């Protein structure tokens, strides 16, 4: 029987797969394919992580069928592969298969939540930091906007609730602004800002965390003041 890979080999594999995702983020398909080949040489073409990488490349090229197949095969080998569940959820959402998307989003939420304590995502100092930056972001708005939002509560929750995810909401969202979505004078202030601390802390640290909290708050506030997704992308709030 083959020996399991060493920790050093696993770290090297993680690095290669991270390179693959960075290449895709930069639009470098050839670089991503080279990273995938390197990963295959290390652990074989049937490894769940390799299948995940292959699915990401397929998604980038518009081949949803291959992406779904590879992700399902990855989950056959590792049913608790949270990233594979999440990517499947996103694909099914795009294909307007809501029930399948929700199924995989719920699995993502459950699997992510298991790791919260292990990854120390409940650190009080970091959670307090998120709240502070969120309030500072609101207070720094021009007066006419800040005044309308000053009394809006900022609530911190680890992740979106199961009930919310059952509606198709992204289990890895960073925040939610509940209330009216058009900044008209004749509507009341929004109910609340919710920031999902575990999702933020799982992805960012230090200055990047503060920048993302600010972007998340501004994105949700933008909805309230009537900005659409194109407006927010143009302003760097997407």
Where are these regions (language model features)?
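Canonical positions in the second alpha-helix
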Residues: 39-40, 73-74, 108
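Structural marker of alpha-solenoid helical repeat scaffolds
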Residues: 42-43, 77, 94, 111, ...
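Active-site scaffold of zinc-dependent metalloenzymes
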Residues: 176-214, 224-238
């Amino acid at each position: 029987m083959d020996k399991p890979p060493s920790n050093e080999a696993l770290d090297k594999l993680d690095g290669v797969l991270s390179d693959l995702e960075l290449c895709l983020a930069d639009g470098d398909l050839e670089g991503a394919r080279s990273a995938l080949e390197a990963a295959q040489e290390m652990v074989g073409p049937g490894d769940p992580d390799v299948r995940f990488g292959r699915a990401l490349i397929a998604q980038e090229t518009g081949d949803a069928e291959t992406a779904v197949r590879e992700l399902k095969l990855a989950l056959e080998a590792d049913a608790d592969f949270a990233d594979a569940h999440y990517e499947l959820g996103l694909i099914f959402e795009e294909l307007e298969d809501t029930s399948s998307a929700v199924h995989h989003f719920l699995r993502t939420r459950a699997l992510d939540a298991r790791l919260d304590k292990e990854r120390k995502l409940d650190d009080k100092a970091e959670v307090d930091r998120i709240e502070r930056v969120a309030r500072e972001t609101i207070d720094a708005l021009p007066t006419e906007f800040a005044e309308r939002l000053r009394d809006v509560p900022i609530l911190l929750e680890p992740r979106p609730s199961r009930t919310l995810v059952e509606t198709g909401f992204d289990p890895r969202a960073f925040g939610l602004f509940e209330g009216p979505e058009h900044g008209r004078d004749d509507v009341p202030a929004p109910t609340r800002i919710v920031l999902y601390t575990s999702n933020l802390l799982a992805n960012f640290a230090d200055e990047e965390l503060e920048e993302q909290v600010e972007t998340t708050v501004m994105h949700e506030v933008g909805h309230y003041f009537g900005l659409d997704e194109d407006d927010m992308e143009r302003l760097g709030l997407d």
